Design a protein with these regions (language model features):
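Active-site nucleophile/metal-coordination loop of metallo-enzymes that catalyze phosphate/sulfate
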Residues: 2-5, 12-182, 192, 196, ...
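Short, hydrophobic/glycine-enriched beta-strand segments
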Residues: 3-10, 246-250
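Long, well-ordered, tryptophan-enriched scaffold segments
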Residues: 151, 158-241, 251-256, 264-276, ...
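Active-site lining segments that contact anionic ligands and/or coordinate catalytic metals
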Residues: 243-246, 287
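Short, exposed beta-strand "edge-strand" segments with a Pro/Gly-rich flavor and a Y/T-containing core
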Residues: 24-26, 86-90, 203-210, 246
């Protein structure tokens, strides 16, 4: 019986197209120089080969899962992207229920999401495609959270400026509130942080007449960067009303869990959040339980 060794070298890749950019190629590696000619194949650990967007490496979780299961695992962001592109997203039972519920009760739809061009917790392109699916007779309120950790800490102002222009195509859509992820996506039971973002989503406690871009720019002037932007709501938004539907669009659950529990507080009395005594229909879906 032949013995097999699985040797994992972190950061050790094969790049022959631009060897001047590959430290391994430039280094003196006599042992690997002997081993490489004996290799029978190469593995691609990025892009669609591991069910990620083309050209993306993402993070080590993908590789851990692929190595551990020895198969390609569908990654949430790509599966959602494919479903939005082929039309199957609009056929999901929970999505159809949320839309029909709003139409039946003449109520609003609230979408919550980390808004950024990355792919760890959510993707802004998903939000834009979902907005195109929603019937124009439904009022849509967006509750957007800023990153500031996986991107530069002040990178989202131009993204918001661009998004505000795109929203002219959707007269039924309004940005209702903003919050840095420090508040809205805490996962360490700092409930006072979640409370501040929750109060804006539920009660619209502190309103500003600024546009979202203006509010972000003023925050930057105070050296308050994306992650720590204070929760705020905007003129034109009141609060979550009876029979509204809520969909949390983050596909990674760890930093969506506490806000979800807060919004579902009537089902979790141990959580010390105030909440309006009214019916709220809340939907939070990860790709793993969309079916």
């Amino acid at each position: 019986m032949k013995k097999v060794v699985l040797l994992i070298l972190d950061g050790f890749g094969i790049n022959t197209k631009t060897p001047e950019e590959n430290a391994i190629v430039q280094a003196n590696t006599p042992t690997f120089d002997k081993i490489f000619p004996l290799l029978q194949t190469q593995l691609d650990a990025s892009g669609r080969s591991v069910w990620l967007p083309d050209g993306q490496m993402w993070n080590s979780e993908v590789w851990h899962m692929t190595i551990g299961t020895w198969r390609i695992n569908k990654q949430s962001l790509v599966e959602i992207e494919d479903m939005l592109d082929d039309g199957s997203f609009a056929k999901l039972e929970w999505y159809k229920w949320a839309i029909e519920h709003c139409q039946k009760n003449d109520s609003s739809l609230h979408l919550l999401q980390l808004f950024w061009p990355g792919w760890v917790h959510a993707m802004d392109s998903h939000l834009e495609k979902i907005l195109k699916l929603i019937p124009s007779d439904i009022k849509v309120f967006l509750h957007l959270f800023w990153d500031g950790r996986d991107l530069a800490p002040n990178s989202l102002l131009p993204l918001m400026q661009s998004f505000e222009k795109k929203l002219h195509e959707f007269p039924n859509v309004q940005i209702a509130s903003l919050a840095g992820r420090y508040f809205a996506m805490d996962r360490d039971n700092n409930r006072e942080r979640i409370q501040k973002a929750y109060d804006e989503i539920i009660f619209s406690q502190f309103q500003t007449s600024d546009t979202p871009s203006e509010y972000i720019a003023k925050s930057y002037e105070k050296w308050i960067m994306d992650e720590f932007i204070e929760p705020i709501s905007f003129v034109g938004y009141d609060q979550i009303c009876s029979w509204d539907s809520i969909i949390f669009l983050n596909f990674r659950s760890d930093r969506a869990r506490q806000m979800t529990q807060a919004l579902m507080v009537s089902m979790h009395p141990e959580l010390k959040f105030e909440y309006p005594k009214r019916s709220r229909h809340f939907i939070t879906k990860q790709i793993t339980n969309m079916y």
